[in-house]
From Swiss-Prot:
Lineage of producing organism: Bacteria, Bacillati, Actinomycetota, Actinomycetes, Frankiales
UniProt remark on cofactor binding: Binds 1 [4Fe-4S] cluster per dimer.
Organism of this sequence: Frankia casuarinae (strain DSM 45818 / CECT 9043 / HFP020203 / CcI3)
Protein name, entry field: Nitrogenase iron protein
PTM field: The reversible ADP-ribosylation of Arg-99 inactivates the nitrogenase reductase and regulates nitrogenase activity.
Required cofactor names: [4Fe-4S] cluster
Amino acid sequence: MRQIAFYGKGGIGKSTTQQNTMAAMAEMGKKVMIVGCDPKADSTRLILHSKAQTSVIQLAAEKGSVEDLELDEVLVEGQWGIKCVESGGPEPGVGCAGRGVITSISYLEEAGAYEDLDFVTYDVLGDVVCGGFAMPIRQGKAQEIYIVTSGEMMAMYAANNIARGILKYAHSGGVRLGGLICNSRNTDREDELIIELARRLNTQMIHFIPRNNVVQHAELRRMTVIEYDPKNEQADQYRQLAKKIVDNDMKTIPTPITMDELEELLIEFGIMEQEDESIIGKAAAVA
């Protein structure tokens, strides 16, 4: 069994990419489980055709404790027999959402949820923002990480931060970076830029996913593209990504770059202009 995790900036299309890719894997005959590690509990909605799956934390609160839960209450099978679990989290402003991830994964292990699987995938909130969300990395639960990014500065900034988190635990937990997935925003020279970023991070751009409106059409119906329009070229993009992950033998310890190096890269590719110190802090009327 391989345990992988998808990380990336919030709003980058991580959950959509993860669900479509796992759908393609299941279509290939792989036995897959998705563990959502986001308080929004939206990591399985396209597989289950639901708004949000009832989470481990929510059910535990209703029952009294995690120990009172039955596995079939939190683990739901969706399309192609994909097993789905959402860790969930507390109400906004109350408690630590990262604790939900820790509690849920521990419960799933004890309850035997990981038996007879080829792939377990963790869909993790945004950046590596706290120890709880970093748990799949920190405790070696996820052996390989895929970072969803784009040619936009903040997406690349988040990717570099995540690489830094992987590096921190690479020697103690054995986690490795499997590659960058470019979820295209149609920015200039985007594929070249992400290939170069990957090179500097000591990894690969494992796949470039072109922008296609069929993804949104499928999402409105709470479906993956694989199910909604299986013959669409976008469905083939996810199939290609799934196969590349299955066959991937390039799992590395990343080499994060500095903020200055990232800005130099963006300037080199024309995404950012060279900073003119003489105009910093000057209003339009003065400049």
